């Protein structure tokens, strides 16, 4: 069990936009603001004893935890330079924590399994390479649910609340805008009122003075938000936010609001 003795050892929860494939570590100009943000983010966090990542790039039929002691690498992107398929992030896994989380989810009637073979996908190894390049903090992943039900993902977060008094960093690794056809792959920041409307709605929901029940209901009904399906033709990059908010159950702080791949993206900290 992680350290619970110090009252300052509270879980930290963050949702951020992780960029396009390996581009953030290739000095891609359209990721400059994001890279700077991620490199400085640990300075405003306590050093965690473990990192749990809910990545947009892992979906399973039931909640699945990465259970490897020494996770391999899963290069889940295509068409990039050869060196991007040689990236390593040799952080240890945390099978004990995976087993404990599986127990928590099962106690909350969420069917769960552990995958001892799966490796780190780029939703983990790209941001953590920027944040914790020493790769010396145990890390693991929790999958999304393939049905992409927003209520189910809020429930995943609620089930994780038993970890709130432990020194763990929970990362929702997605993208607050994820329309592949609309990205500017040349990094040109162009006005996009439709995306602005959605990002502003998301900021209001996560940081505004509303009740937690209203906050959660708005996220359940996220498709009613302005330009929702333009910003998320498919919602796998948004749903890590639902897990984070379901776990935190409080108002977030906006910690990033800038351009990535020519589109505005945001990040929140609880």
Language-model segments: what does each one mean?
Residues 29-33, 92, 150-154, 232-235:
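Conserved phosphate-coordination/catalytic loops
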Residues 84-92, 114, 143-150, 228:
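Flexible, glycine/proline-enriched loop segments at strand-loop-helix junctions
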Residues 56-60, 69-71, 118-128, 176:
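Short glycine-enriched loops at secondary-structure junctions
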Residues 33-44, 151-166:
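Long, well-ordered alpha-helical scaffolding segments within enzyme catalytic domains
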């Amino acid at each position: 069990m992680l350290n619970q003795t110090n009252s300052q050892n509270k879980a930290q929860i963050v949702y951020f936009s992780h960029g396009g494939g390996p581009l953030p570590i290739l000095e891609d100009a359209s990721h400059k603001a994001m890279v700077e943000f991620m490199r400085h983010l640990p300075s405003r966090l306590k050093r965690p004893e473990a990192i749990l990542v809910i990545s947009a790039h892992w979906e399973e039929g039931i909640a699945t935890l990465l259970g490897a002691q020494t996770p391999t690498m899963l290069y889940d992107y295509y068409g990039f330079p050869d060196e991007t398929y040689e990236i390593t992030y040799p952080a240890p896994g945390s099978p004990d924590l995976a087993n404990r989380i599986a127990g928590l989810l099962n106690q909350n009637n969420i069917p769960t399994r552990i995958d001892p073979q799966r490796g780190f996908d780029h939703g983990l190894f790209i941001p953590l390479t920027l944040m914790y390049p020493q790769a010396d903090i145990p890390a693991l992943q929790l999958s999304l649910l393939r049905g992409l039900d927003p209520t189910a993902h809020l429930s995943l977060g609620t089930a994780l609340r038993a970890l709130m008094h432990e020194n763990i960093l929970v990362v929702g690794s997605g993208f607050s805008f994820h329309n592949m056809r609309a990205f500017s792959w040349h990094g040109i920041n162009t006005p996009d009122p439709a995306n602005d409307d959605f990002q502003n709605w998301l900021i209001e929901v996560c940081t505004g003075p509303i009740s937690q029940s209203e906050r959660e209901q708005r996220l359940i009904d996220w498709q009613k938000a302005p330009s929702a399906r333009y910003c998320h033709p498919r919602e796998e990059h948004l749903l890590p936010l639902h897990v984070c908010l379901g776990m935190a159950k409080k108002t977030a702080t906006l910690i990033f609001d800038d351009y990535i791949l020519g589109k505005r993206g945001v990040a929140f900290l609880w």
